[in-house]
Design a protein with these regions (language model features):
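Conserved small/polar residues in nucleotide/adenosyl-binding loops
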Residues: 175-181
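Long, well-ordered mid-to-C-terminal structural blocks that present hydrophobic/aromatic surfaces
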Residues: 102-140
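C-terminal structural cap/anchor segments
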Residues: 134-174
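Extracellular polysaccharide-degrading/modifying enzymes targeting complex plant/algal/animal polysaccharides
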Residues: 1-5, 69-71, 161, 165-169
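Internal alpha/beta core interface subdomains
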Residues: 1-16, 21
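Short glycine/acidic-rich loop motifs that flank beta-strands on beta-rich extracellular proteins
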Residues: 8-14, 30-38, 46, 50, ...
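Short "repeat-start/strand-capping" segments in structured domains, especially the N-termini
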Residues: 17-21, 44-48, 79-80, 101-109, ...
Length: 181
């Protein structure tokens, strides 16, 4: 398959795309490289990520749906996402929702993956001002092997410091979040 390597920032950024498949790829960056997310799907519908090997310095997959303006204007969540049989190594989060999720993330499944030596397994990042229309729902993690993962699951409700207006108080709501044992 295709290899994407040594990107100075986000490696792959599917944006407002529908019914896309990413199969048998390698996404490689040095583990000390900042802001080198492997894949940042934003406001996507019908995304499949299958058999992808990630080894990098930031989040392996970071789901997004708009930071401020685009998320509030179009209100298109990322939805119907299927991640399976992927290997995620080194990075801050193996699969991260946010922090740019102004329109939410819905119907995501991550199955039969390996997370190795990441700081976090599943990470949800929210931030004031990025959530008036945001709902995170129907998230399923199943048959995940974590080895050397410092924190398997974490929700950061106040990711970063403050937003430009300094006083936004919106919150993201979570429903049907499942982590089977």
């Amino acid at each position: 398959g295709l290899t994407v390597q040594n990107s100075p920032a986000w490696n792959l950024h599917p944006y407002f795309s529908n019914h896309t498949r990413w199969i048998d790829l390698k996404v490689l960056n040095p583990k000390q490289s900042p802001n080198t997310d492997g894949m940042d799907p934003e406001s996507v519908d019908g995304l499949e990520v299958v058999g992808v090997y990630f080894s990098l310095g930031d989040d392996c997959i970071a789901m997004k749906s708009g930071k401020f303006y685009m998320g509030h204007k179009y209100k298109v969540s990322s939805r119907n996402v299927d991640i399976r049989q992927c290997y995620m190594r080194h990075g801050h989060g193996a699969v991260t929702l946010g922090s740019e999720i102004a329109a939410g993330v819905r119907h995501l499944s991550c199955k039969k993956c390996i997370f190795e030596d990441t700081d976090r397994g599943l990470r949800v990042k929210t931030r004031r001002g990025r959530g008036e229309d945001s709902v995170v729902e129907d998230i399923l993690f199943e048959d995940i092997k974590m080895d050397g993962v410092l924190t398997p699951f974490v929700v950061n409700s106040y990711y970063w410091c403050c937003d430009p207006d300094g006083h936004s108080t919106y919150a993201v709501s979570y429903t049907h979040l499942t982590l089977p044992t």
